[in-house]
């Protein structure tokens, strides 16, 4: 049924469909009786899925990745829709419109997306107002990025401005230095630039702080970020963001070229995201929390990430192509995998398949 609906929706511009679908999700979870009904249908409440990660209780390991709920307007929707947590944003200190449309593109042949949104959002103050009004529910992380007009030299102060507003209201913070759609942002992943930025954010909040990295980093740079995270006492690393690479796609080259710049998400990034996760786990073991995102569509893929060292996993493009029952399918499947493997909980499986 959803496959047929997807074909109809794909006749409309991607960003318009996003707004319509997101509005529908917020509507059906706004009122208590309907919210409870949706939750009974979509939530998998199974004790083997629970995990305590950086001191927070996660009812299930699959969360919504940043990029869908940019302004935290849907924070009360994600739990009833079956997710174990959600990451809102990316939020910047100042409101900004992002890049000109069209800026979101589908690659159905690859079940992928290309976006060059450019951190369009209404600013950290606006997101803080929404977070302040949220109901008790699943953990919510705030993903913060650099305001486009702010110079790189002033990035620590810019990130800190967002952290001051969102830190008291979110359950954890994610510092995004890996989007390809803000000029110069990925340069902040270099350790000499990243150290003062992360230190400034850490000094301004009391909640756990993680950093989100790109799949396009070299292996040496992945190691360097991991070492820095340990040095500074970060809670963890989110790996990975979208990729600027375009190799191995089923979509014709001329169509991809016509789309132009942007970050590619979905199955084409899965292999590299898994490689980065494995490298990080080999480097840091259980000293940092690893959240794996990038190309996860199936139960087997989510389970593979957990065995490779991910305490939590995330999806966005998988949700778009998988539909409203996607999170439920993943969680039902993971609960089955946990029991079949003889573990008492998903926490016991984290890193169990990693090469020692």
From Swiss-Prot:
Record field: catalytic activity: (S)-dihydroorotate + a quinone = orotate + a quinol
InterPro entries associated with the record: Aldolase_TIM (IPR013785), DHO_dehydrogenase (IPR050074), Dihydroorotate_DH_2 (IPR005719), Dihydroorotate_DH_cat (IPR005720), Dihydroorotate_DH_CS (IPR001295)
Record's bilayer topology term: Peripheral membrane protein
Keywords linked to the UniProt accession: Cell membrane, Flavoprotein, FMN, Membrane, Oxidoreductase, Pyrimidine biosynthesis
MF-aspect GO terms: dihydroorotate dehydrogenase (quinone) activity
SUPFAM superfamilies, per the entry: FMN-linked oxidoreductases (SSF51395)
Any one Gene Ontology cellular component term annotated for this protein: plasma membrane
Binding site for FMN: 66-70, 90, 143, 176, 212, 240, 266, 295, 316-317
Single biological process term from Gene Ontology: 'de novo' UMP biosynthetic process
Cofactor(s) this protein cannot do without: FMN
Disulfide bonds: none
Pathway as given in its UniProt record: Pyrimidine metabolism; UMP biosynthesis via de novo pathway; orotate from (S)-dihydroorotate (quinone route): step 1/1
E.C. number(s) listed in UniProt: 1.3.5.2
Cofactor descriptive note: Binds 1 FMN per subunit.
Function comment: Catalyzes the conversion of dihydroorotate to orotate with quinone as electron acceptor.
Assembly and binders: Monomer.
Protein name according to UniProt: Dihydroorotate dehydrogenase (quinone)
């Amino acid at each position: 049924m959803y496959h047929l609906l997807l074909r109809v929706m794909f006749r409309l511009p991607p960003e318009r469909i996003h707004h319509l679908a997101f509005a529908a999700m917020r509507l059906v979870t706004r009122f208590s009786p309907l919210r409870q009904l949706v939750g009974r249908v979509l939530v998998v409440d199974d004790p083997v899925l629970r995990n305590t990660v950086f001191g927070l209780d996660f009812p299930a390991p699959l969360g919504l990745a940043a990029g869908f709920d940019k302004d935290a307007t849907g924070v009360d929707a994600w739990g009833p829709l079956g997710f174990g947590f959600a990451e809102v944003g990316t939020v910047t200190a100042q409101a900004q419109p992002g890049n000109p449309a069209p800026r979101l593109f589908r690659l159905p042949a690859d079940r992928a997306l290309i976006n060059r949104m450019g951190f369009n959002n209404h600013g950290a103050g606006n997101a803080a107002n929404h977070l302040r009004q949220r109901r008790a529910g699943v953990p919510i992380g705030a993903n913060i990025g650099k305001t486009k007009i702010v110079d790189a030299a002033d990035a620590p102060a810019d990130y800190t401005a967002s952290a001051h507003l969102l830190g008291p209201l979110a359950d954890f913070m994610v510092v995004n230095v890996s989007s390809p759609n803000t000029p110069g942002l990925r340069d902040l992943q270099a350790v000499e630039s990243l150290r003062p930025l992360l230190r400034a954010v850490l000094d301004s909040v009391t909640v756990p702080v993680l950093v989100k990295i790109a799949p396009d980093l070299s292996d040496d740079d992945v190691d360097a970020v991991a070492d820095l995270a340990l040095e500074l006492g970060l809670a963890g690393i989110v790996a990975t963001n979208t990729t600027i690479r375009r190799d191995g796609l089923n979509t014709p080259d001329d169509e991809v070229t016509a789309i132009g710049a942007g970050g590619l998400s979905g199955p084409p990034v899965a292999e590299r995201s898994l490689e980065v996760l494995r490298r990080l786990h080999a480097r840091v073991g259980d000293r940092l929390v690893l959240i794996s995102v990038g190309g996860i569509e199936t139960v087997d893929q989510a389970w593979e990430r957990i065995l490779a060292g991910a305490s939590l996993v995330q999806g966005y493009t998988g949700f778009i192509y998988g539909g409203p029952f996607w999170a439920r399918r993943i969680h039902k499947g993971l609960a089955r995998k946990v029991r079949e493997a003889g573990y008492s909980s998903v926490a016991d499986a984290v890193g169990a398949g990693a090469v020692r």
